[in-house]
Amino acid sequence: MWNDPDVDWSQAGTVVVRSVRDYAAQREEFRAWARSIPRILNQAQVMDWNSDKHYLRELEARGLPVIPTVWLEPEQNLTKHQLHTRFPAYGDFVVKPAISSGGRGTGRYTAIDPNSRGEAIRHAMSELENGRPVMVQRYLDQIDRSGETSLIYLNGLASYQVEKDPMLHPSFRSTEEFHEEVVRSDATNSQEWRWGEQIREIVHGYIVDTCGRDELLLYNRVDIVRGGPKDAHEFYVLEVSLIDGSLYLSQNPTHLKKFADAIAMRVHW
């Protein structure tokens, strides 16, 4: 465990961060721990930025197509009525904390169902009252039809991709840190890799501007969904995972080998 007091992290040549599903609940402690490690992958400053989903707003400002999001902040002191007016008027939508891991605190609701809408208001209010920013996004219907795609980059290079079944079924509510994702395929799609390259370039551009230098990411998982026929974009970015996102290492023997090779390359850099 990253917060185990009996571990002397100074003795580690390189620390690779993977299973830290509780970091969001102890974010400040995790940030301090990461900064204390001499050689950590991914880099502490990069994980710091990625630990708050407001990064999506920053990437959107740089031209990435992100699902339109309403950001709710604790300091706004919003009433239940004000929350109601900020939710979509039709269709399904998603409410989740801006600082979370493994989908915890995520709920899917139906705009025109009074009971569901009321539950969404209570959900958002609970998060805000506990000092946690909230994001509200319309649920894209094409996710139910086509699922999601995860593109995995290792040491900055396109490595493999997986196609996943939708996780947020109607009335989905999450209070757990981990939810099993159903992978339907690991076939490669050249179009999605072209989109992924656009995302990778923008992410690295932001890292350069933020850190003052480029940082080669050991791992980078980009989650995308294809746009629908009436959407303004061909694809949308759901998330960029640089901390503890699943890399689907058990889905294909080559995935684990590629990740091990990537680590070995960095250790002997």
Residue ranges and their predicted role:
Residues A111-D209, V225-R226, F235-Y236:
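Phosphate-binding site of ATP-dependent enzymes
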Residues R18, L72, K164:
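Conserved residues at the C-terminal ends of beta-strands
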Residues Y23-A25, G102-G105, D144-R145, Y160-V162, ...:
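Short catalytic/ligand-binding loop motif for oxyanion handling, primarily in non-cytosolic enzymes
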Residues M1-R39, V46, L78-T79:
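ATP-binding N-terminal substructure of ATP-dependent carboxylate-amine bond-forming enzymes
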